[in-house]
Amino acid sequence: MRTWKKGTAVASTSTLDNVINLCKRRGFVFPCGEIYGGTRAAWDYGPFGVELKENIKRQWWRAMVTRRDDVVGLDSSVILPREVWVASGHVGVFNDPLTECLSCHKRMRADHLQEGHAAKHGIADPDSISLEEVNCPNCGNKGQWTEPRDFNMMLKTYLGPVEDKSGLHYLRPETAQGIFVNFQNVLTSARKKPPFGIAQTGKSFRNEITPGNFIFRTREFEQMEMEFFVEPGTDEEWHQYWIDVRTAWYTDLGINPDNLRHYEHPKEKLSHYSKRTVDVEYKFGFSGSDWGELEGIANRTDFDLGNHSRHSGKDLSYYDQANNKRYLPYVIEPAAGLTRSLMAFMVDAYTEDEAPNAKGGVDKRTVLKLDPRLSPVKAAVLPLSRNSDLSPKARDLAARLREHWNVDFDDAQAIGKRYRRQDEIGTPFCITVDFDSLEDDAVTIRERDTMAQQRVSIDKVEEYLGGKLLGC
């Protein structure tokens, strides 16, 4: 959170709770199926939440696909043949160690228990901790755990009228495999050659044992992934390139660099497909551990194309005509969580400062200082009152601006309260149509962060906003 006092940003430990409350109050995020009691760690995105999500996806797609000549897009199926997941290794090794408290019978991930205990007690190596030392987070009893057992995290479904092995399929736990099985299709149809990438966004599903931390860890989530195919031997250089590019994307969209760090996965904890993985982490301020993963950038080598070649019998190698050689491309994968990114952008933008009120004093003001490219609403048109002359003029202006941007119209309550509402959802510009507008055909445009106001001719409003909302 940014709380401004004499120009200095001061961190607050309550920022995360404030953002969660704001999300629920202002229609960013709602509990799923709330009228029926809800589903644990499942969330619906309201009017402002869905706009913010779409804006983040749009900026990711522009940065990763449309602004580059070496990356193309794909939209693969959520349900893939079972054989895909056998070949990828997910059926065999996509497991987490699950243990059960003998007192309250709550099941939890053993590694999460160790990591939480290590963070609480300042222990460097979580693996050195025996479960006998760990208290149950649910009931408080110490050391009463079953032996950890592997638990497969993929969600099963059956296609067809009979629930037997022939109809067994899985909801994808990652979007990556849909890209790998389409490698040759894209290679030939898009006329690409390594180094090049295939990107996609979409829903994935994991039967998480311990979901939580609001929208951070859920069983249904949205990914933004790209698989970048390179010649073996160039993979380490490309890996570092994508670590740098992806980190810069977050800071370009307003994340404070001090709230980001890189986490290098220890070799003994690498995923089954990875030669090296570096996470971009954000300082969320979670209980027990401040940091959480935003994005993982992995060097998957030729693991995926090699396995799919062997299991399918199809040759997925690339023939380099210029050098007269054939090879299986290595893969560099930047994989970001969309809702985790949304959460980070909101936490980083959350600000409390002071604003003058109508009585000559000051009130506390909550502001989401989002980059305008991400703001759910780009401008709000606010007639000073519901006067029969002002409202039509204001509505006409709002309709004109909606041809270009997502624009709100609000004529309820005092103008100061309407400003506060727009500040809370991150609207960069408020446009007031007042009684002077009837005479001079001009409006007052207020800027969110500085609260500075400028008089602009009503026929120049689009031009004015166009210069301020570049890239939106």
From Swiss-Prot:
Keyword Cell cycle belongs to the record: no
Protein source organism: Cutibacterium acnes (strain DSM 16379 / KPA171202) (Propionibacterium acnes)
Main location as per UniProt: cytoplasm
Protein family (similarity comment): Belongs to the class-II aminoacyl-tRNA synthetase family.
One GO term describing the cellular component: cytoplasm
Descriptive protein name: Glycine--tRNA ligase
Localization annotation: Cytoplasm
The EC number(s) this enzyme carries: 6.1.1.14
Positions with a binding annotation for substrate: 109, 174, 221-225, 333-337
Top-rank taxon: Bacteria
Task performed by this protein: Catalyzes the attachment of glycine to tRNA(Gly).
Disulphide-bonded residues: none
Catalytic activity: tRNA(Gly) + glycine + ATP = glycyl-tRNA(Gly) + AMP + diphosphate
PROSITE patterns: AA_TRNA_LIGASE_II
GO biological process: glycyl-tRNA aminoacylation
Assembly with partners or alone: Homodimer.
Keyword field: Aminoacyl-tRNA synthetase, ATP-binding, Cytoplasm, Ligase, Nucleotide-binding, Protein biosynthesis
Binding site residues for ATP: 206-208, 216-221, 293-294, 337-340
Pfam families the UniProt entry points to: HGTP_anticodon, tRNA-synt_2b
GO molecular function, one term: ATP binding
